[in-house]
Structures are given as structure tokens and as C-alpha cells.
């Protein structure tokens, strides 16, 4: 899986965290691991321009998704495996997201993780134009965010335990001499 991040927003964000959440969602949604994803972070002026150009809507927005190759299951069982596919582009606006995060009472990192999930789901064909679609997409988005956060917490605790174990082993070696 290749995920490229280009931060043109002027705001310092954790690219590693964005890649982590995108990888997690792509794996959970059973997308071919050879798929490629591009993420671009823009300032509000550039996002407003993109929003007007592609959606004909004024002002910036939080996230936009631009799907590339259609990744549908199926095909003949004896057909060769397709090569790497370009999932698409996700464009995020951290400045806009920061305002949303403050209004929601959580961190910018949390908001950007949520928006990354939202963007990946759009690339996979999910939409929220109709009430039923919105209910399905937002429930899936919330579940994936919850699972990713739990995964991150577990990894953090495992890392801390490994560090404690390493220090304990180092101390025991000191006393063995």
C-alpha cells in the first residue's frame, strides 16, 4: 500500500497519523493492499478554490475526495491479478478542520482522523446525499474511528509494556555481573 501525503497547508500535522488511519480503514474495508492513495493538505484559500471549481460551492470545506480507479470485486477466477490501482486523492483542510474540532470539543488530530476516514469511504463509493446513505456512512465512519483509536491505544500500551520489560531485563543483567 502506497500512501503519499503532501502538506501544503502551512499547519503542522502528524502525517504518520494520517497514513496510519488511512491504512487501517483500507485494510478493514478489504481493499487490495497494492492500492495507492494520495492525500493533500491545503490552506483555506486553496481549498475554497478547489471547492468552487469542483463542487460549485463557495468557501472552503473540510475534506474532498477524488476517486480514480474503480475498485470493484469480481472478474473471472482465472484472470490475472490486476496491478496496483490508484484509489484516489483525499484533500483535507486542517485550518477548517481545527475550527470543527474546537466546536466538537476534540483535538485537531481526532478531527483529521475522522475526515480521513470520511474521505476514504467516499473513494470507496459511500455517499451521504440521502438520509439512508448518510446514516450508513456515518455509522461506519464512527465505528472505524472507534476501532482505530482502540487499536492505537492498544499499540501504545504494548509499546509501554515492552519498554518496561526491556528496562527490567537491563536491570537484571546489571545484577548478574
Swiss-Prot record:
Its main location: cytoplasm. Its EC number is 3.1.-.-. GO terms for biological process: rRNA processing. InterPro entries: MetalPrtase_cat_dom_sf_prd, YbeY, YbeY_CS. It is found in: Cytoplasm. Keywords: Cytoplasm, Endonuclease, Hydrolase, Metal-binding, Nuclease, Ribosome biogenesis, rRNA processing, Zinc. GO terms for molecular function: metalloendopeptidase activity; RNA endonuclease activity; zinc ion binding. GO terms for cellular component: cytoplasm. Zn(2+) binds at residues 118, 122, 128. PANTHER family: ENDORIBONUCLEASE YBEY, CHLOROPLASTIC (PTHR46986:SF1). Belongs to the endoribonuclease YbeY family. HAMAP family: Endoribonucl_YbeY (MF_00009). This is Endoribonuclease YbeY. The gene is ybeY.
